[in-house]
Regions:
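Mature catalytic core of soluble alpha/beta enzymes
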Residues: 2-334
């Protein structure tokens, strides 16, 4: 029988991938729920003005519409995908910075994160809930187009070989949270905030008025009603999770999920079912969570530590391993 996850979010994420707990009753926040990047955006703000909420939601939507969407013709990624194999395409400074950062993660991860998987993403079509397993020939054809190594950058211009397409979606929500953080940091009326984009990406910003820590509960990847533990965080942090339960279907007893291994063209099989990364950059956090999932616990842990990030891995047998720094932030649910 085919199974799918569904996206649900109540006030401050009660049924999502990551959940905020422990808000102060003495200094109640203002909460908003909106929609952008094809998912729910939740804002919990400690402020005496709610004007900033609309600015954040619009900025998050603009990240996709202006830069990242593969479906909006006017977005930069769409223009690159349609023209960069014919002649170099000039990028804005913003997208150029994104590409520089993501290609660095690609190199450091040995291609476990690869922003050039657009053809594979379109083939599997998880965004439209496709449950069709592509043929080996079609997957091989996509792989033949090349990889991140074949992306040619010259200053702020980019060229791609024929067939190769960009897809920055694996880092998109993290990029959106970086944008949200820049807005929050420019508003002195905001002392603290938690912003989530979808179920998988969260920003904790500043502090609550009472000085207490942020508490982010991590969902059990095999039981959406349960948690495996809680992260205790102070100040500003980004939390990104990649899991095989977020978008998937099952056929013949096998789970086909949306986190593709760029080296095989198939859903990654690395011995883990969920990876949560904590670091100080949204774009790097999301890229690392994908790369660490593809690499598996041992190599993924090395990659996270290279970036000064912390990571929590849930293995196939549901055992949990994590970086030493994560141990200091972690409270087990059991």
């Amino acid at each position: 029988m085919t199974c799918k996850t569904t996206y649900r979010l109540a006030a401050i994420i009660t049924a999502g991938m990551l959940m905020l707990t422990g808000c102060s009753s003495d200094n109640d926040p203002i909460s908003f729920t909106g929609y952008a990047m094809g998912t729910v955006v939740s804002e919990t703000l400690y402020t005496d003005s709610d004007d900033i909420s609309t600015d954040i939601e619009r900025a998050i939507a603009s990240v996709e519409n202006t830069y990242l969407s593969r479906k909006i013709d006017k977005s930069e990624i769409s223009k690159i995908n349609s023209k960069a194999s014919l002649s170099p395409v000039e990028m804005t400074d913003t997208l150029s910075e994104y590409m520089d950062t993501l290609l660095e993660v690609s190199r450091d991860s040995g291609g476990a994160f690869d922003p050039s998987v657009g053809a594979l993403s379109a083939l599997w079509d998880f965004d439209n809930d496709s449950e069709i397993i592509p043929s080996e020939d079609d997957i091989s054809k996509c792989l033949s187009y090349g990889s991140y190594k074949d992306i040619q950058l010259s200053g702020s211009s980019i060229s791609l070989p024929p067939g190769l397409k960009l897809d920055l979606g694996a880092a998109g929500k993290g990029i959106a949270l970086d944008t949200a953080e820049s807005i929050l940091s420019s508003d002195k009326n905001v002392s603290g905030a938690v912003i989530s984009v979808g179920e998988s990406s969260i920003l904790t910003y500043g502090r609550k008025p009472d000085g207490s820590d942020w508490q982010i509960a991590i969902r059990d990847p095999r039981d959406k009603e349960s948690t495996i533990g809680t992260l205790i965080l102070s100040g500003t942090s980004y939390i990104g999770t990649s899991g095989d339960y977020q978008k998937y279907f099952e056929k013949n007893g096998r789970r086909y999920h949306h986190i593709l291994d760029p080296s095989t063209g198939y859903p990654a099989e690395s011995g883990v079912i969920s990876v949560t990364v904590i670091c100080n950059s949204g774009i790097i956090c999301d890229a690392l969570s994908t790369a660490c999932f593809v690499l598996g616990a041992d190599e993924g842990m090395k990659l996270a530590e290279k970036y000064g990030a912390e990571a929590i891995f849930v293995k196939d047998d549901q055992s949990i391993v994590m970086t030493k720094g994560a141990e200091k932030l972690w409270q087990s649910a059991s």
